[in-house]
């Protein structure tokens, strides 16, 4: 009898453990509501009305665990159309929830709502969410934190505390008016008036000392800083005076840890760093600074945002402490940018393998850069000349979004003929010396063109920067996938030489990669996610000018390899 009871208890115990493991693995459903509403905000002594989520700027933090299902209801109370992109989420078979307007959905109109329903599969780390229509993401953005599954440790020392820090840009003017003026005149856009940490410009701007982000820390602790570059148009250097940072993650993918004093993030990128505080209380406070990296032509916001790292003390006041200020690289320090980027390597461990495709089915070569459109008749423009407007393109195709339906919807119902074409060029139609003397003709062609891929195609894509209207870096973001960065360099990509030096062992895995200024980058990915997926420069004005394209990934043969149908509350155009 005793033996039977013990056996029964043992079986029950093992069943409970198994059930808990399965439950932890399966995840839970988490519900959020985003109310899109107007809010008066004062920065730099100027009060203006901005579009927010739930009246917060930046917006609320979304937290989940790997394996969780997220159902986020977005209710639009403002006259602006809106859609939300969950930047970096794979959206496996849930492309209807990806968010870019007129790509995977029509925007949510005033008085309408839409539930973004997706499951976080095989991902953990720092991501973010933002509006994906016009320049609405200037104020509509926030962190998306994916914690590991229960009882799964980090592959680095457990931090005492985790702190998201979002980099942003503040415009005294309405960002929508800024981009509309630029597109109408053909000129570059007016620059922002400040950079921000978590919405605060800090003490280096006029009338801004009270709006300073402070990070309060204790001595002898390790903090995980979740850095997110949500700026519209600026790549940013970041540093903390007298403190070394250990990089442990990029774009929600763990990396081999390395130490640095300065972090560079392009728009759209995230980087997790460990900050180990000093062992005893220092008689000082420390500036955190961020300012742009830029090599292109035109006007940018070359100002510096400052926050304060302050040590807590139960008796001492910080009022009379000196503030130590760090230094940052010059604005055009491409050498630092390149060396920093090369430091990133995947863990490539048994727990977190680097599944880089070794065999490639399809190869593509995309020339990325600026260009021009002709000025409309009887109008004087302010582009490179008074007869041209600024534009941008991939393989000389400047992308035009549809406005009466979405690419995904037209594809799903089999009515894409009058919406997009499938003849996107796999390489430049007219090759040229991409990083040398630019061609005399800088005019781009315009169209809505995509590349079609069969399910599970392995893709190698070389992204080549160009010198047309100036060389500059381009942070390229791919929706729906992560990719491996197998190679990068300066000058023109050499197909006979450069692939021999690819890293196919531990290349970094990302969703957004900087094409070096005057250089190239090679990526590989597996097209295992059916749907329509945007790929674009995350410098917002370049996206507005057409530096984007889309991949259509066809369904596979099995039921779990097919795109699910759209939800019942899917927004209508």
Swiss-Prot record:
> What cofactor requirement does the entry state?
Cu cation
Q: What is its EC number?
A: 1.10.3.2
Q: Which sites bind Cu cation 3?
A: 132, 479, 536
Question: What are the annotated glycosylation sites?
Answer: 40, 81, 117, 190, 206, 242, 283, 302, 320, 332, 339, 378, 386, 396, 403, 433, 440
* Entry keyword tRNA-binding: no
- Reactions performed catalytically: 4 hydroquinone + O2 = 4 benzosemiquinone + 2 H2O
| Tissue note | Ubiquitous and constitutive.
- Cellular-component GO terms for this entry: apoplast
Q: What induces it?
A: By NaCl and 20% PEG.
Compartmental location: Secreted, Extracellular space, Apoplast
Give yes or no: UniProt keyword Cytoplasm.
no
Which residues of the sequence carry a binding annotation for Cu cation 1?
85, 477
> Plastocyanin-like domain: from which residue to which, for each copy?
35-151, 161-314, 423-557
Q: A single Gene Ontology molecular function, please?
A: copper ion binding
- Gene Ontology BP annotations: lignin catabolic process; primary root development; response to water deprivation
Q: What is this protein called?
A: Laccase-2
